[in-house]
Amino acid sequence: MPTISVLIKPASGMCNMQCDYCFYCDEMKKRSQDSYGFMSEQTLKNVIRKTMIHAEGLISYVYQGGEPTLRGLTFFEKAVEYQRHYNKHGIRVNNALQTNGYLLDDAWCKFFKENQFLIGLSIDGTKQLHDMYRHDKNGNPTFDRIKSAADLMDQYGVDYNILTVVTQNAAYHATEIYNYYKRIVFFWCKI
């Protein structure tokens, strides 16, 4: 039975960070409307209902951005609620979310664990390498906050992966990054 994979962008291209290499910043400037705003709960409900009607095997919902957590935890709680409500045939459902981790707190991590979300956490190696490109909207470094999000996911037992953008500088420091990831041992992270 074929898998249905659905990419959902709850916050369009909106983000709470300003990474130097992010293509969304340039792309949004080129649009006649820079952001399409947040996805409505009605649209979310329709997407889930229709995929459940047509599914025969696994459904994979993947939330990306911009930064999907900007849509708020309630949106994702509704997603799980709709999945349970419309899943009349015992279809297996996977949820995954790619995040910069900036907004993750206890409530998010508890939700991810309880609902078996696979999280992709964007972190670019060591503090020095990460903070070289990944800033908040005011140009401040973000590594400490993102590392705290990883620690919190470890504490809650959330299954997550690391997504590292390989810039020219990161490629030059690939061994250092790899050894850092091994040394830190992101507990639930797949390296």
Which role does the model predict for each range below?
Residues P2-Q42:
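Canonical Radical SAM [4Fe-4S] cluster-binding loop centered on the CxxxCxxC motif
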Residues I48-R49, I53-V62, R71-I191:
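Radical SAM/AdoMet-radical enzyme domain recognition
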